[in-house]
Amino acid sequence: MDWFHCNQCFRKDGAHFFVTSCGHIFCKKCVTLEKCAVCGTACKHLALSDNLKPQEKMFFKSPVETALQYFSHISQVWSFQKKQTDLLIAFYKHRITKLETAMQEAQQALVSQDKELSVLRKENGELKKFLAILKESPSRYQGSRSITPRPVGITSPSQSVTPRPSFQHSSQVVSRSSSAESIPYREAGFGSLGQGGRGLQGRRTPRDSYNETPSPASTHSLSYRTSSASSGQGIFSFRPSPNGHSGHTRVLTPNNFAQRESTTTLESLPSFQLPVLQTLYQQRRHMGLPSGREAWTTSR
């Protein structure tokens, strides 16, 4: 040790040296027992030998050796602590990855819930407006529900329909006298009843022809056939009764494709039939066509 010497006489050689509690070194000749010769303070003395304690020997060792020894210990301590730190960092990294995934899922759910919330708010606003309108005018919507169209029953063409009496022209009675000779006639220029009615309106109206007095020849057999697809009434035959009374006629109507015969009065027939028949008869009469047994038929 190059630095070791007596602090009083500065000797380096010698066998016996002492160290005081105040940190001074003295040789055997310079040492004093009461107080330190350098600083003058009361102190204790310790003789230097190989039997010193480790905590006392460390002051006389090389600093490099002490540093290396401590550095080795420090390195072991640092390596142990670094391993623990690495494990903790790996745990936190794994946890951060999980939290980031959960955060992304939560953000996506939040966006979808925001969209759904906006849609629900819009729908709620519309329903509130509609409810306010209903509270202001409830009778308006009840009236609209009451005028809802309902299904209408349609009579099957196979069923027989009895003509209703015409109260409009029931007071007017057309008298027809019996005749020995039947004057049937057939419409020549009209294909159907609807077309014949339109063709006759150009010459005379049904009201004018209805007001005319029929001739005695009108009591003979008149046959009126309607289209089964349009009216479903079948065949109406106007025939004089055997006893000469022209107030009744025999009407043939089909019922389930089987004809049945019923008796009704001329006044009970629909009011639109007599003017048309009279008009056609008057035209036939003015045209001067010969009479025969052919039945006049027309289809609606």
From Swiss-Prot:
Homodimer. It catalyses: S-ubiquitinyl-[E2 ubiquitin-conjugating enzyme]-L-cysteine + [acceptor protein]-L-lysine = [E2 ubiquitin-conjugating enzyme]-L-cysteine + N(6)-ubiquitinyl-[acceptor protein]-L-lysine. The lineage of its organism: Eukaryota, Metazoa, Chordata, Craniata, Vertebrata. Residues 191-200 have a biased composition (Gly residues). Pathway: Protein modification; protein ubiquitination. Keywords: Chromosome, Coiled coil, Meiosis, Metal-binding, Transferase, Ubl conjugation, Zinc, Zinc-finger. This is E3 ubiquitin-protein ligase RNF212B. Residues 87-124 form a coiled coil. Ubiquitin E3 ligase that acts as a crucial factor for crossing-over (CO) formation during meiosis. Essential for normal prophase I progression and for ensuring appropriate CO designation in meiosis. Recruits key components of the cross-over machinery either directly ou indirectly, leading to the activation of the MutL-gamma complex. The function of RNF212B in CO designation is dependent on its catalytic activity. Residues 155-165, 211-232 have a biased composition (Polar residues). GO terms for biological process: chiasma assembly; homologous chromosome pairing at meiosis; protein ubiquitination. Its main location: nucleus. It is found in: Chromosome. One of its GO terms (molecular function) is zinc ion binding. The gene is RNF212B. Residues 141-232 are annotated as: Disordered. A zinc finger (RING-type) spans 6-40. InterPro entries: Zip3/RNF212-like (IPR042123), Znf_RING_CS (IPR017907).
